[in-house]
Amino acid sequence: SCIWQSNARGVDINHNFPANWEEIHKREIASGISAPHNTRYGGKTPSSEPETISLMNYCIKQNFSRCYAFHSQGREIYYTFGDETPKDSKTMARLLARTCNYKLSTPPSIADGGGFKDWFIHRFNKPGFTFEIGKGENPLPLSDLEEEYKILQNILCLGAVV
C-alpha cells in the first residue's frame, strides 16, 4: 500500500506554495516525480490548487504573527527558509522544542521549499514552524494522537503568549 499525501488531483499541497517552488520542482523531477503522484508532486505551477489559494488568502486577511503547520512524523520542528529565516525564529524554535521535547531539524532537500511554512516566511517575513508530530511510521496511528495532543497543548498555549 502507498501513503497518500496529495489532494484528489495528485498534488501535494505542501509542495504547491510559491516559495522556492521552481527549485523544489526540479528536485521532484530529479527524483522521478513529474506528474500527479501520491506524494511530493508540487503541481504544474505554484499555487495551482484551490486549497493552496484558500490558505494563502486566509493568512493574508488574518495578519498572523507566526504560523504553525502540523505534519507527521518525527517529533521535530522545522523553522528555517534559507536566507529568509526571520532573525527571531531560532530563539522561538528553541523555546518550542524545549516545551515539547522535539528536536530542531532541517527538512530533506526534496521538501525544502514550496511548503506552507516556507511561503508564510517568504510572504510575511514572520516566523513559521512545521511540527512533525509523533514517532514511528506514516500514517501516524490514531492511538498515538491523544499523547501527541497532550504534548502539543503546551505549544499552542505558549504560542498564545509569546
Regions of interest found by a model, annotated:
Residues P108-P127:
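Short glycine-rich, acidic/polar surface loops and turns
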Residues E137-V162:
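His/Asp/Glu-rich mid-to-C-terminal helical/loop segments that flank catalytic regions of hydrolases
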Residues A69, T106-P108, G128-I133:
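Conserved active-site loop/cleft motifs that coordinate metal ions or position small ligands
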Residues A93-S109:
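Short, flexible loop segments at boundaries between secondary-structure elements
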Residues S48, T85-S89, S109-G113, L145:
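Short amphipathic alpha-helix initiation/capping segments at coil-to-helix junctions
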Residues S1-K87, R94, T99, G134, ...:
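Active-site/substrate-binding loop(s) of hydrolase catalytic cores
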